[in-house]
């Protein structure tokens, strides 16, 4: 089981503040074999809430950062591409990304999404195509869709052996 962990695939939550969303992202990360996620919280309050609310914390380490700049520089130092979930003219369908490369998926805050600073630091904007009237999914649902596409590609490539 531990040999199947994906050390070069992670999620970074930028000020995702609802404990049930944080917990769901962490549980999904564990389900696809991610052993650590990153979270940006400027204050100490959310760190306490997430540590008490996320049951998967015993399997998935949450690495906290005070700024998005710190978080992105940490994952880029590990050679990861940083993908921002953001509806923009430059965004591409999340299924067109090569997730067999070292990857960090940046998920924004529930209400306002990803900050301008984070978007400037990201390598690529990605979108989940929406055919209905709504323009976004819940952060935990969106992260699950993207992570399972990453898992699918990595399984085909034999990265879970």
Task: Tell where the protein language model's regions lie, with residue ranges.
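Post-transcriptional modification and biogenesis factors for structured RNAs
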Residues: 1-161
């Amino acid at each position: 089981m531990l040999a199947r962990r994906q050390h070069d695939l992670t999620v970074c939550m930028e000020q995702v503040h609802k404990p049930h969303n944080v917990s769901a992202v962490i549980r999904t990360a564990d389900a696809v074999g991610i052993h650590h996620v990153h979270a940006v919280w400027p204050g100490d309050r959310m760190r306490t809430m997430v540590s008490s609310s996320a049951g998967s914390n015993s399997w998935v380490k949450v690495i906290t950062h005070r700024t998005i700049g710190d978080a992105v520089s940490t994952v880029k130092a590990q050679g990861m591409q940083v993908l921002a979930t953001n509806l923009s003219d430059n965004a591409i369908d999340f299924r067109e990304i090569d997730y067999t490369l070292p990857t960090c998926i940046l998920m924004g805050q529930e209400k306002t999404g990803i900050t301008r600073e984070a978007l400037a630091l990201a390598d690529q904007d990605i979108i989940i195509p929406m055919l209905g009237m709504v323009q976004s999914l819940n952060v935990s649902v969106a992260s699950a869709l993207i992570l399972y596409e990453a898992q699918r590609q990595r399984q085909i490539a034999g990265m879970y052996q």
